[in-house]
Amino acid sequence: MTQQIKYKRVLLKLSGESLMGSDPFGINHDTIVQTVGEIAEVVKMGVQVGIVVGGGNIFRGVSAQAGSMDRATADYMGMMATVMNALALKDAFETLGIKARVQSALSMQQIAETYARPKAIQYLEEGKVVIFAAGTGNPFFTTDTAAALRGAEMNCDVMLKATNVDGVYTADPKKDPSATRYETITFDEALLKNLKVMDATAFALCRERKLNIVVFGIAKEGSLKRVITGEDEGTLVHC
């Protein structure tokens, strides 16, 4: 029986940390294989998938790692870290027989295409996974903002924010055992309750463009597929 697909084209935001697994830094092979396997399953269902990946598993511009380094320089280093992650994802997809393309907001033609919106949309329509690297290409903007921007540019049905928790909670579930998960919440309610769904710039862009967000746990087996088919998974942040 063919499963109902709620979202035809999605922008998936993956943090760099989600690729570390149990390692203290870098890319964990088993973790990236598991993550890509989950995504490949929905691609085979006919879902068009764009991915924005962070670089925090390698280097984060806003961190103690950067020390007294110039902020713009540190951010550019973080962008290059996202390119490394994007190449690793592309390799993992192609190992599974899924065609993938990396588009970078910074020009590095030997290893990735330079971002071009029409070409990216064409790839999505052809069933290829498009991995957007190097954030927005500008310092001082997070990869959350890059994800909101690419999601809007690609005319995605939804932005999927993969995290290490399975949704948005009333409080930090690691600190407060009585915290409960929201199944749905509006943008206005999230602002009123000061729930940190993502950074303010990204959140404002999604709200303005009416790009709904689903926050879910990518490490939970089958979670992405359940989101795509409209099951109760994660938290839907909507207009």
From Swiss-Prot:
Main localization of the protein described in the UniProt heading: cytoplasm
Reactions catalysed, as given in the entry: UMP + ATP = UDP + ADP
EC number, as in UniProt: 2.7.4.22
GO molecular function: ATP binding; UMP kinase activity
Membrane-spanning intervals of the chain: none
A GO biological-process term: UDP biosynthetic process
Localization terms from the record: Cytoplasm
Signal sequence extent: none
Superkingdom of source: Bacteria
Pathway: Pyrimidine metabolism; CTP biosynthesis via de novo pathway; UDP from UMP (UMPK route): step 1/1
InterPro entries with a match to the protein in the record: AceGlu_kinase-like_sf (IPR036393), Asp/Glu/Uridylate_kinase (IPR001048), Uridylate_kinase (IPR011817), Uridylate_kinase_bac (IPR015963)
Coiled-coil residues: none
Residues reported in the UniProt entry to bind ATP: K13, L14, S15, G16, G56, R60, T163, N164, Y169, D172
Residues that coordinate or bind UMP: G55, D75, T136, G137, N138, P139, F140, F141, T142, T143
Activity regulation text: Allosterically activated by GTP. Inhibited by UTP.
One of the record's GO cellular component terms: cytosol
Keyword vocabulary terms for this entry: Allosteric enzyme, ATP-binding, Cytoplasm, Kinase, Nucleotide-binding, Pyrimidine biosynthesis, Transferase
Protein family: Belongs to the UMP kinase family.
Assembly: Homohexamer.
Record function comment: Catalyzes the reversible phosphorylation of UMP to UDP.
Protein name (Swiss-Prot/TrEMBL): Uridylate kinase
Organism whose genome encodes this protein: Neisseria meningitidis serogroup B (strain ATCC BAA-335 / MC58)
The gene coding this protein: pyrH
